[in-house]
């Protein structure tokens, strides 16, 4: 019996040691993740500042502030500005994600109008749809109530969703639909693109993940926009999901309370 007790005591001591070791490793990993997020936030800020200056001077040169540019030079400057803005968008995505992971992203809660957000997104992205000869529809329910939340961040989410829809749709239409029911907004973005397989849908909202097919590789992207959108919606106490089948287009939908009184912290 003494031997059995000694064996059990040894096992218990070893279990405690293993538990403490796992706890220490978990703490170290969490600290490393926080350091990484802080580094990315600082680095993104340092990159964004000079890039904004480069874009500003490029725009001034294209507008003739330093002398009338030739037609060839205008084309070069326009391509330079377009690529610079694309890079700035990537940096902003990394900055947002690092802020979210570090717990530094705060919602700025105020009144907003979901109709105005939808109209703003359409006016911003309709030229891209027109370039591809895509119809751009708004399907807004009448008399939608005023919302309370972070309207700027919700605009960012909708721009991400509509931008993706336009990027991956080569014919047909893109539509924004908005409705309200039982104290919640229901907003969806529908497209007539190639659709997404069930296997790819499962990873779409993860950081740096995209649908694994030739179309995605051709269109490009970082796989950050949907992950950021998911976190923003969850911070509003809402959720986001996709319904799609290959060859039948996709519909991304998010729902959130009409009135958000406080930010929901990440679990």
Q: Model-found features: residue ranges?
A:
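Primarily the dimerization/phosphotransfer
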Residues: 23-66
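Helix-loop junction within the histidine kinase core
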Residues: 65, 98-109
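Short alpha-helical segment within the cytosolic histidine kinase core of two-component systems
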Residues: 67, 119-131
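Conserved catalytic submotifs in the C-terminal HATPase_c
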Residues: 74, 108-113, 130, 135-145
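Short alpha-helical segment of the dimerization/phosphotransfer core of two-component systems
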Residues: 82-88
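Conserved glycine-rich
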Residues: 172, 237-238
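ATPase catalytic-site recognition across NTP-hydrolyzing enzymes
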Residues: 202-206
């Amino acid at each position: 019996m003494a031997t059995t007790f000694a064996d059990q005591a040894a096992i218990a001591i070893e279990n405690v040691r293993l538990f403490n070791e796992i706890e220490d490793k978990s703490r170290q990993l969490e600290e490393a993740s926080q350091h990484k997020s802080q580094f990315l936030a600082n680095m993104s800020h340092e990159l964004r500042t000079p890039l904004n200056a480069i874009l500003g001077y490029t725009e001034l040169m294209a507008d003739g502030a330093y002398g009338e540019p030739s037609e060839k030079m205008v084309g070069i400057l326009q391509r330079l500005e377009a690529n610079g803005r694309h890079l700035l968008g990537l940096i902003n995505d990394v900055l947002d994600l690092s802020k979210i992971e570090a717990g530094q992203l705060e919602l700025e809660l105020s009144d907003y109008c979901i109709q105005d957000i939808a109209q703003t997104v359409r006016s911003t992205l309709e030229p891209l749809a027109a370039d591809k000869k895509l119809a751009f529809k708004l399907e807004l329910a009448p008399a939608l109530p005023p919302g309370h939340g972070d309207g700027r961040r919700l605009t960012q989410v909708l721009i991400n969703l509509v931008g993706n829809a336009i990027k991956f749709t080569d014919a047909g239409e893109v539509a924004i639909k908005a409705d309200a029911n039982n104290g919640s907004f229901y907003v969806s973005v529908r497209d007539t693109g190639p659709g997404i397989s069930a296997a790819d849908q499962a990873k779409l909202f993860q950081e740096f993940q995209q649908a694994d097919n030739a179309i995605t590789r051709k269109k490009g992207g970082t796989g950050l926009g949907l992950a950021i959108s998911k976190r923003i919606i969850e911070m509003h106490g809402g959720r986001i999901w996709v319904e799609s089948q290959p060859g039948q287009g996709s519909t991304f939908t998010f729902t959130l309370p009409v009135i958000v009184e406080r930010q929901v912290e990440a679990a």
